[in-house]
Amino acid sequence: MRHKKEIVKIGEHTCILHSEENAKFFITQPVDNNDTEELERQITYIEDNSQAPFIHIAIRINRWNAELTPWPAPPVFGKIPFGDGAHSTLLYIIDQLIPALKARFALELNKSNTILGGYSLAGLFSLWAGYQQNVPFRGIVSASPSAWYTGWLDYANSHQPQVE
């Protein structure tokens, strides 16, 4: 693996950084403990299939059902209801994470080189973030997003995506 791995605390979140010299793209991904077990394999796969140098930032989400969902909803699996923390998570990425990464790597993170992605509820969060005004992302990647989430389809049909 050509990326250097670091675990750092940025604000209230632990972040797992995989960085390389001369990075041109920044991939931000909210993750839970299960996702962190797959990160090495994921980074290796991207390295093997892309020539573009990149930095991958995994943000460990502490309360999965609360921090990634844009509005409250009753529990679907188990007993934990969904919250409305997506707004706060997006503000964390914009106001704390991105400035910290700019300072750490002395590189320009901007709308032309920053990608947000996620799996499951993090995929839903990524899709939702792509509909928000003035987001600093060029693109959104969403694998198996939780599009079943209460109200999501109505929201997506009544709003316009703001990313390319």
Spell out what each predicted region is.
Residues 1-164:
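Non-catalytic cap/lid and distal C-terminal segments of serine-dependent acyl enzymes
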